[in-house]
């Protein structure tokens, strides 16, 4: 069906090209999420290769063969994922052979590998499917970047078709060890991002004008982000010339509405220690509050080990600020520390779905070890005491203006009759505006509900948008300003029953 690719005819403006063929009924039926194509696109892009197409096909030999035949003749590299194995629906080798009009045969080296893994096998046994490859197949043994050792199992390629496994961990290991197979095009792509706090409709005309002027020299992508606390649109400039991309970025910023470009820190967690401690050394009022809070946290770390401390975390704005402070203090004190930051979550009845989603995102961002318990605070602490008797101190995001908190001190033992813990309160002297200034100065992610008019969050049964943030926009529609725009902080709890 297909002939061996003529590489020179599959270049695009001097750049190597690729197509990705994802094989598997489980993808098309929604049983499995495809992460392989995203990984491959990123990896190939870094190697200067333009991915022109991603196709998903079922485990049907004729369908796979047709796609392999068509795609392999139009791109420099065709990468397949999935359909390698001992079962009836693993038909990728057969399909590639059909595409190139070749027979399958038991490759001697593949046979040895199969026997070494499965033991003695017969020609008609299921494991032998792994050794049956197209006649012109080549075995490519990659090098593990971490160990420097040759990978045990090879990547099979046929002409310009590279047949990867479908299991993400195996595919990623194989690709990382064989990236040299796809390098050498000489192309380097240069990308710049611009974050804009404006709707796409407000900037669409400017973007069209700029793209028309640049033509094919620079590509401009516009991507709305409904879940960001700091921007509404991410603009991506892409070209193979660093001079062109820098020139385009300057033109883009000049063309956008004044004040709409956000100098976003895209990964505030990785620079937390540097940025938080830099802020603490400033002579601003916020800097002094940060320095005092860090002092309390550092005193706790002097007294307790990391494994004896946890952060009380429910996803609210105060404990989000506290978590970032504590994370910064830990990274400053133990830059190579392996202990995960521990957090205690007392789950309430009827939590907001947005809050639950934010909790899961936060666990990933900070690599938290989360203890989730239910019930009253006393019941929860009793349960934690049984499950984790080594914990001795709980960092809390309490402020002095919170109910029943005006007599607290930075270090407060729990009351008699309660489980024995030290309550550590680094934020006692912080105000509502201090919390928001800290979060937004450092671009720390927080629960999106705070951008929708909520100023204090509990459950869905007792939390409402704050009437003080209600407004009517230019279209006459009722909207709510974000929580950080609340002027009178004494009205903070007007959104709670």
UniProtKB/Swiss-Prot annotation:
Return the SMART domains for the record: MoCF_biosynth (SM00852)
UniProt source species = Danio rerio
Where would you find this protein in the cell? Cytoplasm
* SUPFAM superfamilies according to UniProt: Adenine nucleotide alpha hydrolases-like (SSF52402), Molybdenum cofactor biosynthesis proteins (SSF53218)
Q: In which pathway does it act?
A: Cofactor biosynthesis; FAD biosynthesis; FAD from FMN: step 1/1
Cofactor(s) listed? Mg(2+)
Which stretches of sequence are listed as region FAD synthase? Answer: 308-465
What GO molecular-function term can you cite, just one? Answer: ATP binding
Region feature (Molybdenum cofactor biosynthesis protein-like):
19-110
Q: Which GO terms describe its cellular component?
A: cytoplasm
Q: Write down what this protein is called.
A: FAD synthase
* Reaction(s) catalysed (UniProt annotation): FMN + ATP + H(+) = FAD + diphosphate
Q: Write down the EC number.
A: 2.7.7.2
Where does it mainly reside? cytoplasm
The UniProt comment on domains reads:
The molybdenum cofactor biosynthesis protein-like region may not be functional.
Name of the top EC class for this enzyme: transferase
Keywords for the protein's UniProt record, in alphabetical order: ATP-binding, Cytoplasm, FAD, Flavoprotein, FMN, Nucleotide-binding, Nucleotidyltransferase, Transferase
Give the record's family classification: In the N-terminal section; belongs to the MoaB/Mog family.
- By its UniProt entry, which Gene3D superfamilies does this protein fall under? HUPs, MoaB/Mog-like domain
The answer to whether keyword Protein biosynthesis applies is no
Q: What does this protein do?
A: Catalyzes the adenylation of flavin mononucleotide (FMN) to form flavin adenine dinucleotide (FAD) coenzyme.
**One biological process term in Gene Ontology:** FAD biosynthetic process
């Amino acid at each position: 069906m297909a002939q061996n690719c003529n590489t020179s005819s599959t270049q695009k403006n001097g750049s190597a090209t690729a197509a990705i063929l994802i094989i598997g009924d489980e993808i098309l039926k929604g049983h499995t999420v495809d992460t392989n194509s995203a990984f491959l696109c990123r990896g190939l892009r870094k190697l200067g290769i333009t991915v022109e197409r991603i196709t998903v096909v079922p485990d049907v030999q004729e369908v796979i063969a047709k796609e392999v035949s068509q795609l392999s003749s139009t791109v420099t590299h065709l990468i397949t994922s999935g359909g390698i194995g001992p079962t009836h629906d693993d038909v990728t080798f057969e399909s590639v052979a059909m595409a190139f009009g070749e027979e399958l045969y038991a490759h001697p080296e593949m046979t040895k590998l199969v026997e070494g893994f499965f033991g003695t096998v017969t020609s008609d046994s299921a494991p032998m499917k792994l050794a049956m490859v197209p006649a012109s197949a080549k075995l490519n043994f990659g090098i593990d970047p971490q160990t420097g050792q040759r990978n045990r199992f090879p990547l099979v390629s046929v002409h310009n078709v590279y047949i990867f496994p479908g299991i993400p961990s195996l595919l990623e290991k194989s690709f990382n060890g064989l990236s040299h197979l796809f390098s050498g095009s000489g192309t380097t792509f240069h990308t710049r991002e611009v974050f804009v706090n404006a709707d796409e409709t407000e900037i669409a005309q400017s973007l069209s004008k700029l793209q028309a002027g640049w033509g094919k020299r620079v590509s401009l992508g516009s991507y709305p982000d409904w879940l960001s606390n700091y921007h509404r649109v991410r603009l991506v400039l892409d070209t193979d010339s660093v001079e062109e991309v820098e020139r385009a970025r300057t033109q883009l910023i000049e063309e956008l509405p004044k004040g709409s470009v956000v100098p976003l820190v895209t990964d505030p967690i990785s620079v937390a220690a540097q940025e938080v401690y830099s802020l603490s050394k400033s002579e601003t009022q916020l800097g002094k509050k940060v320095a005092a809070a860090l002092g309390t946290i550092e005193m706790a770390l002097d007294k307790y080990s990391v494994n004896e401390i946890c952060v009380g975390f429910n996803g609210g704005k105060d404990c989000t600020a506290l978590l970032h402070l504590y994370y910064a203090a830990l990274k400053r004190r133990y830059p190579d520390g392996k202990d995960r930051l521990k957090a205690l979550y007392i789950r309430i009845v009827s939590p907001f779905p947005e809050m639950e989603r934010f909790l899961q995102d936060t666990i990933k961002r900070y690599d938290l070890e989360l203890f989730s318990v239910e019930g009253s605070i006393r019941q929860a602490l009793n349960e934690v005491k049984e499950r984790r008797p080594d914990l001795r101190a709980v960092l809390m995001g309490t402020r002095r203006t919170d109910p029943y908190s005006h007599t607290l001190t930075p270090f407060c033992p729990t009351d008699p009759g309660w489980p024995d813990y030290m309550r550590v309160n680094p934020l006692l002297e912080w105000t509502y505006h201090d919390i928001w200034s800290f979060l937004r100065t450092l671009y720390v992610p927080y629960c999106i509900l705070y951008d929708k008019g909520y100023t204090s969050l509990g459950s869905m049964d007792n939390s409402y948008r704050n009437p003080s943030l209600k407004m009517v926009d230019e279209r006459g529609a009722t909207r709510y300003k974000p929580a950080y725009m609340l002027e009178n902080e004494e009205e903070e709890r007007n959104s709670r029953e």
